[in-house]
Every structure is written in structure tokens, then in C-alpha cells.
């Protein structure tokens, strides 16, 4: 019968209809009862009205009334399904749906399968596949199981057992231990067996009773003998039943301790197995571990909260928490937290039977099984329980009792023996020694107990002492084994290694963590350090690192660390000088307990706050040695910590944290001797090996603080002067407030030395030194910096540390012999360790002073031995006789060995200009050897006397004050005596060194084959490396050069040395130096200039110190040749001033940061002596003021300092006239040129005569041997732009018209024109050279040439006016030729003088070429244009003077018109100039490359040039006749005829010009390839000069329009028509002289010109102005034709070469015959062979490729800018009489060749101007 249909109240038809539509999530209107809804839903699903899968959606959408849980829902669903499954009337489809529903409920995890298995019938479970057994079988199995569990009874057989038997058994077992012997045990065993048999007792019951009795009396050994009679398998079961009894819920009593102990004893006796009994214990391990992890996480969370700031706290609460007066430290806070945690875990020990069994094992001393349980229960941390920890402590102490007794006896014996006389150990004492050994179980126990050993500090100290004795015993065993066989020694070493590992393990896992929990017990820390100190620092640091990691794994240690960190921060907030004592002790208490955390926190605070260093260092006086060691580890750890930048964002300065850390470490190590430094030094060594040297700042601070050895770049003048003094003087100057007898300083210095040079450790002093030196060499290459500014900063920092470290080593390692034994040899330093020469000598220099003579062992190098030896054998014998005395038995090192090493340090070609003796002497000496700072000695002695006087005036007469004063007086008197004695000793030392150097000087450079390169090599190899090494070395270099000069060292030219320094090498050195190096270089330049200005101050000073010195010889190879005169020296000073000004301005106007900064630093360093002139100072001050507005702050600061320095020097600035001292005529006076000088000396005279005047900007006239060529070498075009374009732009509004000069009034002067004129200014000043004519010329000749010189000099003045780009003021300068001539004229009555017309022409060209090369110095001289400086020696004849004035006025108009015309032509025909200029430029380049061509090759060119010379002479004759004829005609006719004649010559001579010019150029082009090949090395010096030859295309000398003809009475007679034409066409290159046969006519013309009045000159000037304007317009039409002729001339040049050679050869021979007599004039300098092609390529470095055999007597002209210095006969002969005349005699044979070349170079194509300038360049460059 089926059940009626169910009435659904909740799962209604509407609900079903919505479900069929797929809307299963329809919410019911209200909550429904769960059971009713599930029942209705199940029936709906069974009937199939809804699909089974919709059940989940329906359940999710329904809301039940009672909100049941998931388990309750599953249970109700299972009940519903079970109820429906019992319906027998259900159809098959419905039942299948029901089964399907049940499966779905299980699969969807809605109902667990276990619930269906419990409640459903077997058949339903089988159908639903919920059981694997059939329904019938499952029913049978169920019946059997129920029967066995419910109806089977336990049999106890109580009827057969009698209580009497058990009573007798209990009596037998409880008799006590009186009969506990072996026989008694056997008898007891027999009785028990009898009782079991007689009373039929259950053996298991008997065994149980035996165990119970054993539990009560565990000391009764009889029970142990009774147990074996029972089966072992039963024992574990019986004990298991006992433990299970206490696991019952109804039993509330804990397990008896006796039961744990009984079980542990049975397990220990191996009667039962631990695993068999462990299975009966509860709770299970997994459950316990899970509970412990929850509680441990809670404790970790609480520990991490310690010290965190509560952001929700109000300000008032925070103030209450941080009251100033409430600074307290709770040392037990962490322990209180631990006690609370242990109290919470106390029930765990009662309920956990495993922990009870572990405690039982410890109670029976069974460590083996206890260790097994410890390892198994490690996640539970069982040691935290006091009972287990106490049992472990007892077991540890029992294990070490015997060892502790031995250790105590050994310690007592060692302490007692130390107080008595030390006995020699014997074999018996060694044999009786007891070696301590500890079992490995002790170390296992220590690892297990971990940090909880803090609970028993007494045991902790015992363990420390035992471990120390244990380790020392192993060390003794190794020492004893070292005297035995190899196998025994290896065994002892293996044992030591094992002992060390065990001790380290005990320290890391137990002792150090325990210290962290001991509240402020320094004794414990001391005991631990006694063990730690036996280990090397590497092992200690590893333990400290592991210690920190262990803290994070234990909540107890973490809490202690957090509390210590919080307390430390609170103390540091209040730490100050006032409360230092109180808070310092509190810091120490915290550090005693938690040193790692406290010290790390303090270091972190110091990195952030530098002002905390001093109070913290003072507070650390209470720390123990262990804490000091941990502090060093913390510092190294902070250094090595990754992720922190050690440089600031600018990449230059060190980070604040690193600077603070280094300063802190230096102060700490200085104050506390307990600090160990070996670890830090090893870290620095390792970092240097990796190429990282930033951390060297720590070494710098250590040396500075501990040894008071400081390195500073900004020494005062007094300090720098004292650096040359004795040790006492240096100490007083650089002690920085430290007392000499400061005991603390001495101790700290010795500690630092001992740390670097320990007795038993690797000595790191020398490895650290070598690594620093190598890092210095590589820092520039390997520096990871984007800007060179950062690289230089790193280099300077490393270099400073190197100097400081070497200074410390040399002073700390005493005596010097110990230092010599310590450092490697010079050969090893250079070749093995690859140190640079300057660094190697820095290290080896103290060792060089140990070289002593074999014969006189008391005298060491560099003192004079006092022995007299002949000059030939002196040096060689001294080399072999000096040996190195280091006090060892090693092979003696001789001085010759050092020289052999020195020879390998430089390339072989360097020794052609240097000698090893000079090189070794230079690098071996110091400032102390050369200079006695007497003023500093006297000043310091005066200070000491003042201090004594001050002490005597003290009125305090107390006993303590008197005692203190007495000690102070003794100290001062000691310093006085020492200073006085050292002053005398120093003077004797310098005198002795000077005697030795005086003996050796003659051999230093005499054997050098290439004397031309001496100064360059000396600068490159010696001066520059050392003068940039340190500030004292920069002074030393200047002193050494002065010493070379004062000693009269042969072949060392002092003037050329300064010239090469300033003109060739100074600018590149400024650009490539670092910040500190350029400061040192500036100091060297300051000292050099100071000496030079001292020589310039007075002529008497100059004559006394320089006048007769080889250093001022004109010829390199002949030291006894003529000397540079005082006038020439003043002129070269002008050149040097201009060069320095120009290069400084170029750098200041550069876009490169380094150049600007270095120039400012250089200017700051030399501001004491430079600038000298007011103009130069103003120019430099303007540049500095401009830089003050720069956005870069460091440049602003430097510029401000420079401005202040210049302002301070303003009162000392002088005018140009005062600077020139009358030797530089800044306004052109009459020029007197001797004809003979012109004809013989050729180029040489032309240069000197031409330099003060200037007509056109001849671009190629740049020849400075010493410096001008170098000036132009260095990036000429950028130099022009930077140097002069800016000033001319800024001051272009200041152009003014002055003196009625029509040139100055023209506003159309272009910028390029000014640049061109500035470029051409240098030779006008620096090339001035006094020319002394021969006595054979007449007065008439002098007068004739003076007229021409006057006109030319007037041109120079106006040319200067045009060149001035700033103020537009005309500048006039006068050649010193006429000054020296007139000076000598006053001394030598009757001496005839004359100046050639060639010289006058040369002056026109060279004067204007000086502007640009003088740079800013030209600007300095502009305001002096209207003033003429006259030498006091100038006495000019009245008639000559009046004539000169007339000609100067005429020349001014002439030059003005010519320049104006040229400027117009360039402006109109600019587009047509490129081709002619390029062709001429090519010829100029080819001419410059023709430097080293031999005389034979040159003569082929001379033959071509002779033709043009004769042509020029013929034209000169013709012009002269025409001018004489015109002189008597009216002025108007003269002007017209002169103009017509000039135009006629211009048209007529162009045809001749083409053939001659091309033929001459052909000779130059022929060997161009060979010359290029030879001069390739020189082009690097001359290429810039080539570029500079065309700084501006508008004023290119080859492309200028031809000037109009001059009036007849103004045109210089030396300028032929063709020369004038070619110069205007752009081909003017060389100077041309008059032929000797025209001398008489020239004399007459000169006399006639003297009679011209001033009115005539004015009239002619006005006429000339009008004529030139007209000529200017007419010339424009001719200019185009001239350019076409220039192109044709280039094409026809090669064709005309053969004809020119024949013609030139004949003319050259004729000229040679005419010039033979004056060429050998005594007392004059022989000119050098040169030709026109040597215009400028012989400038900077021409001497490098010049062989001695290819030049006779080479004049040093670079520093004079005028290669030939000619003396008048009387003076020259008098000087030559005092010197060796052989050099002059040797040159006579070659004078004819010199003359040929000079004449040819002057007359090639009639290009007079270029030839004279070429002479200047060539002669100067050959030096």
C-alpha cells in the first residue's frame, strides 16, 4: 500500500514551475523549517518534477529558520533519504532517482558518505555503491562484530588465585635493600618462582606487582635482577596499561613521577624498547606541535610589538611615556615575559606523558634516550620547562665535574707560576701534563640546552672555563706533537680541528645566546670572551653572524632583542655631555646583556647623527672586551651591507653615513686600546683586491686619529715652509694641537702599527700599501663614474690616503733599517708590483738614505763623504762604494744596483737627455736636503721663549701649579734645545748635500747625446710627476730647479726650462690635472715665478745670480757661451706673463667644467705673484666675475675666492711701463739697424728688429721655440674664439678714436679683423731682441737706416690700435734693438751702428703677428698706447731723435691708409679669396713641414731663391734712384709720381712674379713626402700652428688686396716694388734686405731725410691720405686680375723651376762672396742655417728630431722669441774672453752655409716679411 501524496507547503507547484523554467534561485517569501523543506524537496526530486542537479541551487536560495550548520544540514538530508528509501511501494524509476540523489549528495560533498553508511539499509548502500561488500555478507559481518563486542566476557580466574600468595609476594618485595647482594637477588628470584607455582599465581600479575614495588623503591638493585625472569614483551604491555589508566577521563590524578622513572630505567637497561612503550603514551606528537605553534606565534607577535609606536596615541600620552627624568632600564622585561610563558605551559608538562618520560630519562642520567626524545620533540621546545631544564643542567654539570676540577688546577698552577720565577720546561713537566678531554655528549647537551643556560650562570661560567682549558689542552698537544714524528703531529692537528669545531658550536648555540638573557652580568661576558679570544677573528665574526640569525627563531631571544633596542633608543635620545656618566653606565648594562643588538642600534644612530660620536665614544668606556670585539664586527657588517650607496647623489662626496662611521671608528680606536683592527684591515685588503677603494676613508681616519698623521692639501705658508724642516719643526707645525710627548698618542700609534704588523698573524702593512698604490693607478681606468669630475675626486681621495699611509709607516716603523727590511726593493716595486715611478720612490725614498760608503760608514747618502777624489773616477767609484746597510746578512745592495733599476724605469730614448744619476738624485732627495727654513726655526724658537716667559708671569703659587709649571717649563726647554740643535744640524746637512751635488753636477747631463730635449724630458720624467704628487713636493721641485741653476749645472738651461714649462706644457697640464694636482702644480708655478721675479727685480740681482750662470747660456750645447742679458730676460718675462694670461683666459672661457675649475684653482695658487700688470689683472678679474654667475655652486665659490685674491693684489699691480723696466718700449722710438747684422745674421736680426712694429697680420709668424709654437699648437681655433671673441663682444661699445688717428675712428672694424690682429701680436713683444752691430759701420749708415726704422715703428703703433678689440686704443711698442744699440753707443764712443732695411721690413710683419698670441696680455697693454717707456740706458742723439719723430708721424698715416684699404678689399671680394688663400696655405704647410731637411737638400732650394734676390736688389736700386730724383721736386709732383710709379710697378711685376713664385714653390714641393715623414712626430706640436695661420678668412695674409704705393719719402728703401706687390697679393712670406752695394746711397738718403721739417711731414701726411683714398678705389678693379694671376702662377710654377735653379745658383754664390767677411765677426752669435720653409714648424718640439751632428751652435731662442742674440764687439769679446771660445770657433766653418740659407729664406720671391718671422721660429724651435 502506497503512502498518500505529500502536501507540499513550501515546495509548491509555483516553485516547481519556476524551477522548470530554470529559475532555481527564486527566494521563498519567508524562512522555512529545514527538515520539512528537505523532505518535500527530496520527494519532488524523486518524483522527477525537478532535476537532481537543481538541488544545489535550491539549497543556496532557501533560508531556514534555525540557521543550521553544514553538519546539521547533512545529517537531516541523510535522515530524509534514509526514510524515503524504506518506502517499499516506491516504483523503480523513483528508487533509481533516489539512488541517484544519494550519489549526487555524496559527490557534491553535501552529505558525507559516512552518514549514509551509518543509517541506510545494506541493500540501499549496495545499490548506491557505497559499500564493497554485498548486502548479505555485510549483515553477517555486522552480527559477528556485535556479538564479540557486546556478549563476550573477560575471564579473570579469581577462584583459582589465592590472596595468601600475593601477600607473601608483597612481603618478599618490600623487605628493603638490606639483602641487596647478588645471592639475595638469586634467592628472591627462587622464592618468587615458588610462590607462583605453589599458589598458582598469574605471572603477569606478579610482574605487575614487582614493577609497582620497583616504582616505590627505585634504588633497590634487586629489582633489576628480578626483571629478566619475566618476558620482555609483557613488560611494555604492562607499563602501557599503567599509562593508559591515567589517560582515562575519570582519572584526574597525574602520572606518578616514579612511573616515568621506572619506565626510563627499564628502557635504559634495555629491558624494554623505547618504541614499544612510546606507542602507549598520549597525547600524540602532531597534536602537541600544533598547539605549541599557535602559542609560539602569539608570543612572536607580542615580541614584535615591543618598541613600535602607537599611532593612535595622543601627544599627551607620548609625553608621559618619554619623560626626561624617567630614564630607566628594565633588564628583566624579557625574562618576565618568558616566565609568564613557562607558567602558561606548566599544565602541558603534567598532561604530556612524553615530556614526563623525557624528564624520567634525565633523572636516571640516560642521555642517549633523552637525546632521542629531545630531537623528536624539538618543535615543542621541551627545554623551556624548568623541570626538564634542571635535569639537563644536572646532567651537564655531572658530565663536566672531573674536567672542571682539572681545569681549575691548571688555571691555579698557571697563575701561581706567573707570579714566581719562570722555570724552564723539562721533559718531566711535559710528561706529567694532563690533557683535558671532553666527551661529545657534553657538547650535545650544550646544543640542546641552548639559550636557557642563562638560568644557571654558575654552570655557564664553569662551562666557559672548561671549554677554554679544553682548547688550550689541544693547542698544547699540537705544540708537543710538532717535535714528534709526522703522523703524531697530524693526529694532534686533526684533534685540534675537531676541538675547535666543538667549541665554536658550543659558543654559537649555547653560550652567546645565553648571554643575551643574563641581566647585566659583565663577569659572564668576560668568561665567554676568554673562550672567544682563543679563536681567530674570522671564526668569531662567523659566530656573531649566526647569533643574530638565531634570535629570529626563538621568541624569547626576539623579545630580549626588541626590549634592548627600545631601551637603547630611549637612552640615546637623552645622552649628552651632562648626563654622560649615568646614561653611559646604562648603555653598558644593556650592552652586557645584549651586546649585538645594543651596539648595532648605536651604530645605526651614529650613521644618521654625526654629533653623537663624541658622547657615545665616551660612554663606551664601560664596555667589556667582548663588546668591543662585537662592535668591530658590527662596523664591518655595516660597511659590507649591500644596497646602500657609499657616495652621494653627486657621485663625488662620500655618503654621510660612511663619513660618520669612519669618524666614529677612528675616535673609538684611538681612545680604547682594546679595539682590534686586524679584521677591518683584512676587509680593506679584500675590497682593494676587488677594485673597491671607497672604504679607505676608514684607514684615513684611523691613521689620523691614532697616529695624528693627517693629510691636508690646504697647508698654510708657515706649515708648508716647516715641511722642509726637521722632525720637531714639522711636528710643531702640523701637530694640530697634539703634544709631542702625549702618551696616549704614542700608545695608539703603536697599537695601529702592531695591528698592521702582528707577530703571529699575516702582516697586512705592505699588502695594504701595495694595493692602495695599485688602486691609485687603476682608479681612473676602473672608476664607475659618468663624469670626469667624479673620477678625479676618487683619484685625489685615494692619492691622499696613500700619502698619509706611507707617512705613517715611515714614521711608525723605526728604526729606518726595520722599514728597509719591511718594504720590497725598488726593482720589485716597479717591475713585480707595477707601481709608478713616483709611488715607488715615495716608498723607497727612506731606504735610499741607508746607502753608506764602504770607506766612511758614518756618512750616508746624500751627504758628502768629505773625501777628495779626482773628477773622473769620483762618480763611478762612489756608485760601487755605496752599499745598503739594513743590518741583515742578506746580499748587499749597491748604489749601482739602484741605478740599474732606474735605467729600466724609463724608455731607452729618455736617457739620451737624462742620466740615471740625476734621475735617482732628483727622486731620492727631499725638501729637507735642499732648503733650511731658518725663519720658521726662529719663529718657533721665539714662540717657545714667549711660552716660557708667560709661564714665569703666572701668579699662582700653589704647590700643584708650581709642579705643573715646572713640568711645562721642562717640556718647553726640551723643545727649545731640540729646535736649536736641529737647526744647526739641518744647516750642516744642507751644506753637505750641496757639496755632494756640486761634485756630481758636471756628470749629470754632460754625457747626454741629445741635449735639446733635456728640459722637456726633465719636466716630463721628473718635475711634473713629482710636483703634482704633494704640496711639499711641488715646493721641492722648484727648489731643485733653483739648485740646478745655482750650482751651474752644465747643459741645464734655466730660462728654457721656465719657458718650456709656461709656453709648452702648462696648458695641457692644467687641463689634465685633478683638483688637488692642479693646486700643487699652481704651487710649483708660484715658486718658479717667485724666483724668476726675484731675478727680474733688479739688474744687480740678475747679474749676481744669473748673469754668469750656464743656465742662462744662449746655446744649449755650449754652457760657457754668451748669456742672456737682463733686458732680454725682462722681455721674456713679458712673454711669459702674456702666455699665462692667455691660457688662463682660454680655460676660464671654456665650456669644459674641468678647465674652468682648474684654471680658477691655478689662479688662486699663483695669485701671490701673478698677475703683475694692472691690465692682466683686470682681464682675469672680469672672467672670474662672470663665473660668479654660473649655476654650478663649486665654481661660484672658487670664482669668489679668485676675485678676493685678485682684489687683495690690486695695490701691487703695476703698469706695463713699470713692468717692462724700460726694456720694452711700448711706443715706437727710432730703430737703428746695423747693416752688417742684417746681412750676416739674416733671419736672427730680422726678428728682433721687426717685433715692435707691425704692418700686416702675417699669419705664419708664430715661432716660439719655448712656448709660442706650443701656444698655437693647442687647439688654436677654439682658443681664438674663446680667448678674444668674448671680450671684444662685451666691450665693443668702447671703441674710441684717439690722437687723431684715422684708423681708430673707423667703426667698421670687423670682429675677425680684431681676432687676426690679436693673433699676430705675440712676436711683436716676445720677439724683441737687442742687436749689437759690428764696429766697422759708419755713423752715416746708422742715420740712413734709422729713418726706415722709425717709419716702421710708427706702423706698429697704429696696428696695435686696430688690434685692440676691447677699448680701441692704439698700442705702440718699441724694439729693444735700438735700446741696446743706443745703450752700447753711449759706452763705446766712435762705434758705428746701422740697421738694415730688411730689419725694418721685418718689423712691419712681425709686430702685428704678436697680438693674438699674447692673448689677454695684449689687452693689458692697450691703455699704454700713448706712453713711451724709455730705458735709463737709452741715450739717443738729438738729430736722430728728431728725424725719428718725423718719420713716425708719416708712417702712422701710411700704415693707417694701408690697413683701411686692405679691409675694404677683403669686404668686397671675400667670395674670391678662398682659392688663393688655400693655395698659399698649402705652401705654408709645406714650408712648415720642411723642418729637418739637411743642409744639402736646403741648398737646392737656395739656388732657386738667389734669382729672386738679385731681382729684388735691382728693383731696390731703381726705386732708390727714383726717390732721390723726386726728393727735390715739389710735394704735389712727388705724390702724383709716386702713385703712378707704384701702379706701373704693380702692373709690370706681376708677370715676373708668376715665374719666380712657381719656381720657388716647386723646390719646396719636391721633398714634401720625406719631410712629412720626418716631421710626423713634430706635427702634433705644429698642427695647431698651421690652423692658426688662418684664424680668419677675411684677413688672410695671402689673400689681402695690394696696398697703394707709398710716398717716395716715406716708403722704406728696403721694400722693393715686387715685394710690395706680392705682399698685397697675398704671397708675402719672407723678409728682404738691401744689397751691400747700396749702402752708400742709403747713407746719403738717411742724411737727407734727417733735414725734413715737421711741417713738411704734416703736409705729406695730408696728401697721402687723399692719395690713398683714391688708390683704394682704383685697386679694387685690379684685385680680381690678381687672383687670376695667382691661379695661373700655381699652374706655371713647376714649368719655371729649372730656369730658376740656374739663375738662383749664380746669384746665391755672388751673395755668399759678399757676405764672407762679416760672417766670422768675433763676439757675435753665429746664425743657424735655415730657409723660408721653416716658418713655424720648428716651434714647440723641433728639437726632438734634431741630431747633434746636423747642427753646429744652436741658439736658445724660444724663450726670447728672437732666436739670434747679437752682442756689440766690445761686450761680446769681453764676455767671450771669460768663457770657452771653442763653440764659437767651431761654428765659423759653417757660417757660409748659415748665411746662404738665411739669405735665401729672406729673398724667396721677394717675400721679405715671412722670411724674418721664419727665422725667429726656426732658430727658436731648434732649441
UniProtKB/Swiss-Prot annotation:
Residues 1244-1382, 1394-1823 are annotated as: Disordered. GO terms for cellular component: nuclear speck; nucleus; THO complex. The keyword Transferase does not apply. Keywords: Coiled coil, mRNA processing, mRNA splicing, mRNA transport, Nucleus, Phosphoprotein, RNA-binding, Transport. The keyword Hydrolase does not apply. It holds the Pfam family Tho2. Disulfide bonds: none annotated. Its main location: nucleus. A motif (Nuclear localization signal) lies at residues 964-969. This is THO complex subunit 2. It comes from Arabidopsis thaliana (Mouse-ear cress).
